Amino acid sequence: MKLVLIIAMAVVVFGISVSLISVQGQQNNVIPQWIKNNAGWWADDSIDDESFVNGIKYLIDSGIMEINIDTTIQDQGDFYLTYKPNPNSPYVEEDSAIAFLKNSNLLEQEINFLNENFRLPYDVEVLAQECGNANAWYDYEIKQIVICYELIDMDYENYIYFHNEDLDYAYETVDPYIYDNLDWTFFHEVGHALIDVYQLPITGLEENVADQFASLMLSYTYDENTGDYSIGQDMLYNVGTWFWISNELYSVNPDDYPFWDTHNLDIQRFYNISCYAYGSDPQYNQDLIDEGYLPEDRAYWCEEEYLVMERAWSFLLKDFDNGFFD
């Protein structure tokens, strides 16, 4: 334990992020004699703190002690996907939630993206299943993201109902609407997973932080052929629409609503996501202000709000990504 504390102290002094220290010529974790001597002299006050630290610094600078700073976490796990049957779907098989998921290839694509860009210390399952209610969550005990088929069904039904006066438009646009909101929901739960797996030191409500991560990920979505980022902006527009519709269909009764809940009200999440979209690209999203969806008083700070959010997540994940935020 004394040895670990000594090495840790030296590392902190030099400001080096260390995941692995290897000494030339030493194998199988054998502690070399020079470390024992140096540590012993320091522990016995035969040398002062400065001499001890300078000795470690010399070994690092001269290459005798090799420091691997390429990774601070080993990539020992992956996100992986499991589909469970969807026998109780209210729709025919080809229109079921599981069929939508599999045909869209959404989860497969995003899981590949995550595994390419982030290092996990262990596996995290993404489970698509029937839950008995419309929901999605991250299970901290078993390290599992759950996407419920009922959530997809509910999104479909609410969207069609909300646009019942123009069903042609509703049926034409419902699939991308569901896709975008499912994508955002998935990344929201991934945000929870990353906070847990990496033990990220967040401040504020975790639900809000997960909302920010999901919105940030969608804002990065672009057309690989043209480099057009408007795709991500349109996806955020659909997510905002999702919360707007939910607010309209499920009005809040102050006497019944659980204001103690960790989630913001749907209308608050609508304004937050609209702000993130505007902040990431004010010119493209000027219509949010022009059409009265985003008040100018909030929009004034949205660019800074987005940059703070981006810097925060970049800093939090700098030791765990493969250069995604570089």
Give residue spans per PLM region.
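Acidic, Ser/Pro/Thr-rich low-complexity regulatory regions
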Residues: 3-8, 15-75
